[in-house]
Regions:
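Conserved N-terminal catalytic core of the sugar/cofactor nucleotidyltransferase
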Residues: 1-53, 58-67, 71, 89
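A conserved hydrophobic position in a structured secondary element of the catalytic/binding core
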Residues: 2, 54, 122-125, 147, ...
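Structural motif
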Residues: 21, 50-52, 83-86, 143-144, ...
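A short acidic, often aromatic-flanked loop/helix-cap motif at beta-alpha or helix-coil junctions
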Residues: 28-33, 93-95, 126-128, 215-217
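Residue-level signal for inorganic ion chemistry
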Residues: 38, 57, 101, 148, ...
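A polyampholytic, Gly/Pro-enriched intrinsically disordered region
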Residues: 41-52, 106-112, 231-234
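Conserved core of the sugar-phosphate nucleotidyltransferase
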Residues: 63-185, 207
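Left-handed beta-helix
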Residues: 147-244
Length: 244
């Protein structure tokens, strides 16, 4: 999933080599629209499907341990059909590029990972609240989640019908000659919404946080973060010294 303005010639060639369905948004309209474009195709093919959502630019190590965490989250979301399992990770410093999760009451444990209700989802721009949350044991919002496709669809239907109606119109056009034209028309009217602070916030009593355990999580959107992530796992970097 990407937006048209982010798609380079090299990137397009890379995605063509990867199996699966590669979707391009006409333009960026926030994280909710990006997720729901993919979700629309899932709902068309299998309305009872389980879905996992995660950004493509994260480094998580070791991969096998993360896969186990993600598998556990998916099992929980399958058993508790109306619940969304959002993954959080303990932060060692005051992050400014990510949102935060204020955990609430304990719901249980799974293989060493704490499952808790969520008291609040904090926007990354809310610095004062972030400082308070960090001191009180908040976790960084990875934006990685497991849920049934139907539960996310219902959240938008009940709380953001304008957005969902646009995707329903697009859903009806999938496979037809006017599919791309319908998508472009939908995005001309698409509201800019956040998956976390809009969609998930609207169903917060159905969202739990599962704290990632025994993994290193790092955002690799810039070279400095790549270097930091490699250093944590004891790997040398070939990046220029001026970046390191």
């Amino acid at each position: 999933m990407t937006a048209q303005e982010d798609l380079t010639a090299g990137g397009a060639e890379l995605w063509r080599q990867i199996s699966g369905k590669f979707l391009v948004q006409p333009h960026s309209c926030g994280t909710a629209a990006a997720v729901f474009l993919g979700l629309t195709h899932v709902m068309s093919e299998d309305p009872e499907a389980m879905v996992v959502v995660y950004p493509p630019d994260y480094f998580i190590y070791p991969g096998a341990r993360f896969a186990k965490n993600l598998n556990d989250a998916t099992k929980i979301a399958r058993e508790l059909e109306q619940w969304v399992v959002l993954l959080g990770v303990h932060a060692e410093r005051l992050e400014t590029e990510h949102g935060w999760i204020q955990p609430g009451a304990t719901l249980g444990w799974t293989d060493g990972s704490h499952l808790r209700r969520i008291e609040a989802l904090l926007n990354r721009s809310d610095v004062k609240s972030r400082r308070t949350a960090l001191a009180s044991g908040c976790v960084c919002n990875t934006s990685i989640l497991a849920a049934s496709a139907a539960s996310l669809w219902a959240a938008a239907r009940d709380n953001f019908p304008e957005m969902l109606h646009l995707f329903q119109d697009y859903q009806a056009s999938i496979g037809s000659d006017n599919q791309q034209a319908t998508l472009r028309a939908a995005y001309e009217k698409m509201p800019v919404l956040s998956l976390s602070t809009d969609i998930l916030q609207s169903i917060l009593d159905q969202v739990m946080v599962m704290e990632l355990s025994h993994v290193v999580w790092s955002d690799w959107r810039n070279p400095e973060w790549v270097v930091d992530g490699l250093r944590v796992i004891g790997r040398r970097t070939a990046l220029p010294q001026r970046i390191c």
